[in-house]
């Protein structure tokens, strides 16, 4: 989680002009399919922050809230349906203050700590290594452990790896057995620090790259467990960080992380999650789409040092970041989640699919009750957010083959003081044009083709023509996510205001799909 200040919050009027075209044309290139969309692109992130863990994922075995061995039953079942592929933990900024030995053994003996990064909350360590890794086993997802480099020692991280993954007669394996777990867990992903340029230690790239080399050396592979080591990478426009790590440490890492938030700035108001105008919406869509330029630029730097693409890029924090909801603790980052957030999810996933030759994982922030979450909870109530519904609708693309497309659609020109000032602050050309349609397509192992479409035009239905080429189809069935207002969201009193519905505004004739795509809608189709 980011704790940096480099960009002013700018909520000033912007000028938007839109081309007159009220239709869009997509050409599908199924014959050029090569890349597999890794399921890890749909990864999640859980930090000890606010009520993400306590009250979100975990309530404890003695809670009156229905639970499975301490895990909230309603949340667990919803995540099981989502088919979470990978879960990152324990942070975020919390990771570099977390000492794993405080979170093992009898809960009554675990020491408490102050969560200094996030509101000064008292952390009782009742959710630790066993609780996290057991949850991953229950969900059927890969664990992604973020190790403490900022305030921890090499020995501490090395022993944690041994504790989790050694099946031998080693000291840490014996300690694990003493704490009730005989067989070692399978742990693939290991992050060596988090945001080391900021909350993880305020380090220079050169210093961190040397630390990475040292810490990663002692994170060993035990038995048949093979670690996938991930260096703490850059924040959005910090090209030098990626350059230095690739120059100095690429042969010792399997991946390098990247963080990018759709946020107006890090000083002052970030804007309301639920109260915004049309200009705010379109500016947000432009900021969201800038992630493509950021990914491309970091990939080009990596290509200079690693043309074989042996080192992956992992976008292990992304999503929207608004002001917290009124009446909530500022450091707990609890925000509502509207149809606007759903579009940030769909547009981002469309972009991610295009770059999976290098981009192998993405973890949205965060899974429950924090930032752009899948789920919100309050006492014994739970609600699924519009973002949850996008992830479920897009689940058909996991492990499918990406099908390239050409897209011709209406374009909005983004001008105004907001973008001009941002460009000066970040010393990088910001996005000046915004397509009104975003799309992606894939073919799964059974040969089924799925197409996802987003119409971000808030007022106009668009007729989308999809040329299928050699693909044979006689009909298409699908789901749509939309609502009466772009600011609509689900509440504990009205949990189903924004939810998917059946969609049949599709005609198929002679290799062409004609889709009537309503204003502010997201659709996923299956060709038949």
Locate predicted features.
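Beta-strand-rich domain onsets/edges
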Residues: 286-289
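Alpha-helix capping and helix-coil boundary motifs
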Residues: 10, 128, 277-279
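Bacterial Sec-dependent N-terminal signal peptides
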Residues: 1-23
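Active-site His/acidic residue clusters
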Residues: 261-282, 328
